[in-house]
Amino acid sequence: MIDVQSQKDQRGISIQKVGIKDLNWPIVVMDRENKTQTTIAKIIAAAELKGDIRGTHMSRFIEAIDELKVVGPKEIEKLLDRIKEKLNSEKAYIRFDFPYFINKRTPVTATLSPLKVDCYFEAEKDQKFDLKVGVIVPVHTLCPCSKEISEYGAHNQRAYVTIEVRMKKFMWIEELVEIAEASASCPLYSILKRPDEKWVTERAYQNPRFVEDLLREVVLKMKEDGRIKWYKVFVESIESIHNHNAFAYIEGEITK
């Protein structure tokens, strides 16, 4: 059978990334509480294509992914090596976006329920391996200005903290989530009984946060941790009294 993809191309244009996207695929990720957790990822996989080759072999990306048993740092690097080998490429790229569930107990009644956190792993490899881990954590914020100027109450809302890191040493997804939650006015819970709802309401009121406050607290906690070498943080507040949202953004390196 003629291999059309492997035909010579005379245009001499190398392609930085060519591959597949929006592949929904079952994966197993590492879970601090239960060792592993099965979820569904939306995957992008790509490779560099040399200028003298007409096309890539798309099915080989899926073949490489199908060999993956658990998605962790070492396994992702091995996957990129397989993609490079199967596609005869100098550089490979992969991204997994997936929901991750963390079992949480409420603060008063200790009711157990899962909280969904959207996560992603993004990695590439040529001669060097580069991995970024991201979490998008829902939290609760209460406005310090609204509290200060009001005789009672204050506007409050859900916010989302996106933390993306390059690590020096391994960290659990749960640990990144805990950094975001500890920096907010209050964590979120899927189930709240009335005593829990009272606690959450009062906790947020006692701990007001602007998006700027929340972002700075996240950065301070990451610097104190010692296992992170680079970070990107994006905080978005879904404003409850405005027809717009508020946000704050930062990225940087941690050299110590």
Swiss-Prot record:
Sorted UniProt keywords: Hydrolase
EC number: 3.5.4.16
GO MF term list: GTP cyclohydrolase I activity
Domain of life from the UniProt record: Bacteria
Enzyme class: hydrolase
GO terms of biological process kind: tetrahydrofolate biosynthetic process
Keyword Protein biosynthesis in record: no
Database matches in InterPro entries: GTP_cyclohydrolase_FolE2 (IPR022838), GTP_cyclohydrolase_FolE2/MptA (IPR003801)
Any matching Pfam family: GCHY-1
PANTHER family per UniProt: GTP CYCLOHYDROLASE MPTA (PTHR36445:SF1)
Family named by the database record: Belongs to the GTP cyclohydrolase IV family.
HAMAP family per UniProt: GTP_cyclohydrol_B (MF_01527_B)
Protein's name in the database: GTP cyclohydrolase FolE2
Lineage: Bacteria, Bacillati, Bacillota, Bacillota incertae sedis, Caldicellulosiruptorales
Gene: folE2
